[in-house]
Curated annotation (Swiss-Prot):
PROSITE patterns: UROD_1, UROD_2. This is Uroporphyrinogen decarboxylase. One of its GO terms (molecular function) is uroporphyrinogen decarboxylase activity. Pathway: Porphyrin-containing compound metabolism; protoporphyrin-IX biosynthesis; coproporphyrinogen-III from 5-aminolevulinate: step 4/4. One of its GO terms (cellular component) is cytosol. The gene is hemE. It comes from Bacillus mycoides (strain KBAB4).
Length: 348
């Protein structure tokens, strides 16, 4: 069955004019929602993501509760790694932990390839369920970027400084580029499978890429990113690039064949455009503001919207994920305000 969906988000991704500014929030599904916390009392993250009905329910919750203009598939960026031979455990209070970190070219050469229909069928089944039976807004698929995935694989878990990752990059360039190629292949195959299953846009999260300088990005990371965007682009869905702490890298994305640049709060939208970002923009509220009193939030959001709305092709989002402490009512009120204020301003 083909469902009719609200395409405001997709129009903004394509740089088209919209009646109002579309909004969705990174980590909109999950830890800040009481309904989700009740589910987590009974099921682990692994169990939720491996159960299409349960995962689809969690994915759809913020659409129903907050009236956001897009859903993003509820899963972890580490989800595809076991398929290529990486033993990952999500530990409460820590995050992803890998007991056997990458240390050599031999370790890289042991990595396999992903076959999504065989290795992650539950993800594809969740997408099909959502897009054929449940959603009236676009579903966003996603993947971690090679650098961020590699950082977990080399560090063995979250890191504050990525010393091991960068040391490996500098000291073992042959192994590094082999790892980038392996991960790029995985990301390409994984995103294509999500698109074939029904997602209407894809976002690549490079959560830790802000740790590298421009010259190193250009040499050690950008070639893999160029290949990912070039090979996924013919699939015909909007592609979003989001890096955290990556204001210094925005100019490196100008020649990547992507559709939307995701910004965090460190770079104002006006400044990004002044620096040559002439495609759609997504962002860029500091999620910390969501813990402030409503008048403070409203004034701050007005400022972001006033910058974003100066050109067609703007999507409101956070610069990083929703905190567990955020009141769901705040997100509902925020979406309503974004829609109403932007509609009023754009009608002038």
């Amino acid at each position: 069955m083909v469902r009719t969906i609200n395409e405001t988000f997709l129009k903004a991704c394509r740089g088209e004019r919209t009646e109002y500014v579309p909004a969705w929030y990174m980590r909109q599904a999950g830890r800040s929602q009481p309904e989700y916390r009740k589910i987590k009392e009974k099921y682990s993250l692994f169990e939720i993501t491996h159960n299409p009905e349960l995962c689809a329910y969690v994915t759809k919750l913020p659409v129903d509760q907050y009236n956001v203009d897009a859903a993003i598939l509820y899963k972890d960026i580490m989800s595809p790694l076991p398929a290529i031979g990486v033993d990952v455990e999500i530990k409460s209070g820590i995050g992803p932990v890998i007991d056997s970190p990458i240390r050599s070219l031999q370790d890289v050469e042991k990595l396999g390839e992903i076959n999504p229909e065989d290795d992650v069928p539950y993800i594809l089944d969740t997408i099909r369920l959502l897009t054929t039976e449940m959603l009236d807004v676009p579903l966003i698929g996603f993947s971690g970027a090679p650098f961020t995935l590699a950082s977990y694989m080399i560090e063995g878990g979250p890191s504050r400084n990525y010393h091991n990752t960068k040391a490996f990059m500098y000291a073992e360039p042959k192994a590094w580029f082999a790892l980038m190629d392996k991960l790029a292949d995985m990301v390409i195959t994984y995103l294509k499978a999500q698109i074939n299953a029904g997602v209407k846009a894809v976002q690549i999260f490079d959560s830790w890429v802000g740790a590298v300088n421009v010259a190193d990005y250009r040499i050690f990371i950008k070639p893999a990113m160029e290949r990912i965007f070039a090979e996924v682009r013919p699939m015909g869905v909007p592609m979003i690039m989001h890096g955290v702490g990556a204001a210094h890298l925005v100019n490196e994305w100008h020649d990547l064949p992507l559709d939307v640049v995701g910004l965090d709060w460190r770079l104002p939208i006006e400044e990004a455009r002044a620096r040559g970002v002439h495609r759609a923009v997504q962002g860029n509220m500091d999620p910390s503001f969501l813990l402030a009193p409503w008048p403070v939030i409203e004034e701050h959001v007005k400022g972001i919207l006033d910058q974003g709305m100066k050109q067609p092709g703007y999507i409101f989002n956070l610069g990083h994920g929703v905190f567990p402490e955020v009141n769901p009512d705040t997100l509902k009120r925020l979406t309503t305000f974004i829609h109403e204020y932007s509609k009023e301003q754009l009608a002038k």
